[in-house]
Amino acid sequence: MSCQGPVCTNLGLKPGQRLTVKGIIAPNAKSFVMNLGKDSTHLGLHFNPRFDAHGDVNLIVCNSKKMEEWGTEQRETVFPFQKGAPIEITFSINPSDLTVHLPGHQFSFPNRLGLSVFDYFDTHGDFTLRSVSWE
């Protein structure tokens, strides 16, 4: 079962700041999505852990989107997620990229859109949001 999650706007996240998301992955999860960007049409990071979706199994797919144009996918094979389990994910904003901090693993994704401020966050899919914090 998938549903639209909350949308946060006017976050004002700049290099040196980070966004931490906590929640519970659904017991029957196929995938979930977290987006960070300027707005819903300018996504600096589309973060999509896939348990079994779009032909991918236990894979994290990241991308960027400007208007309706998607960039090239970046795929991460380290998959620290478990169905039905709590998770904490932190996104650190850097001048030229974002660092995604996961349990026992981290990776970077380039700031392809050259955003100086990340104002937008949304999440949807097989994930129940418990908290969002930024500093």
Swiss-Prot record:
Regions that span the bilayer: none
Residues that coordinate or bind a beta-D-galactoside: 46-50, 54, 63, 70-76
Tissue distribution of the protein: Mainly in the intestine (adult), mainly in the skin (embryo).
Superkingdom of the source species: Eukaryota
UniProt GO molecular function: lactose binding; laminin binding
Statement: the UniProt record of this protein carries the keyword Transferase: no
SMART domains registered for this protein in UniProt: Gal-bind_lectin, GLECT
InterPro entries according to UniProt: ConA-like_dom_sf, Galectin-like, Galectin_CRD
Pfam families xrefs: Gal-bind_lectin
A GO CC term assigned to this protein in UniProt: extracellular space
Keywords of the record: Acetylation, Disulfide bond, Lectin
Effect seen on changing residue 8 to V: No redox-dependent shape changes
Matches recorded under PANTHER family: GALECTIN (PTHR11346), GALECTIN-1 (PTHR11346:SF97)
Function: This protein binds beta-galactoside. May participate in host antiviral defense through specific interaction with glycans on the viral envelope glycoproteins.
Quaternary structure annotation from Swiss-Prot or TrEMBL: Homodimer; disulfide-linked.
Protein name per the record: Beta-galactoside-binding lectin
Protein's organism: Gallus gallus (Chicken)
